[in-house]
Amino acid sequence: MAETAYIPRLREVYDRDIRSKLTEQFGLTNVMQVPRLDKVVINMGVGEAVNDRKKVELAAGDLALIAGQKPIVTHSRKAIATFKLREGQAIGAKVTLRKAKMYEFIDRLINVALPRVRDFRGLNPKSFDGRGNYSLGLKEHIVFPEIDYDKSGESWGMDITVCTTAATDEQARALLTAFNFPFRQ
């Protein structure tokens, strides 16, 4: 009895609709030229970690709930006296999502988290890096439903970078628009 593997909803949409639409739109001949999502990197910098090391552990725990996998604690590369920062001190956490977890996270980001952001007017369409990757920042991590604000107690910001295989920003924008990223007009 063969079990069918779980395929995330957005992956099915990409395979069924988006891939053929992008192939037609950009006149691509090779299947491997079609832009696709590569990975999502979520970074959470904890500025208060200079005074209290427990804050990084709390942030890493919340990031694990959001991402669905254990984050890596990031450390400072050099000492900065004005910030009372020593070399090698824990200052944040990051996680890299690929494949199924990446599609699940993007689905939750677009359909659940972004609509819960206060005064949300759409994503900035100029936040592409020139190589087909898109970055956005959230001021509060509590917009994700996995986080209970009463238990978390604090609110940290996070940087989210969506890496694609697109060669240009135009292709990446078309790919993310097809995934229903709410870009500002």
Curated annotation (Swiss-Prot):
TM spans, by residue? Answer: none
Q: What is this protein called?
A: Large ribosomal subunit protein uL5
InterPro entries membership: Ribosomal_uL5, Ribosomal_uL5_bac-type, Ribosomal_uL5_C, Ribosomal_uL5_CS, Ribosomal_uL5_dom_sf, Ribosomal_uL5_N
* UniProt superkingdom: Bacteria
- Family statement: Belongs to the universal ribosomal protein uL5 family.
Q: Which SUPFAM superfamilies match?
A: RL5-like
User: What is the recorded function of this protein according to its Swiss-Prot or TrEMBL entry?
Assistant: This is one of the proteins that bind and probably mediate the attachment of the 5S RNA into the large ribosomal subunit, where it forms part of the central protuberance. In the 70S ribosome it contacts protein S13 of the 30S subunit (bridge B1b), connecting the 2 subunits; this bridge is implicated in subunit movement. Contacts the P site tRNA; the 5S rRNA and some of its associated proteins might help stabilize positioning of ribosome-bound tRNAs.
Organism of derivation: Afipia carboxidovorans (strain ATCC 49405 / DSM 1227 / KCTC 32145 / OM5)
Q: Name one GO cellular component term.
A: ribonucleoprotein complex
Question: Known NCBIfam families for this protein?
Answer: PRK00010.1
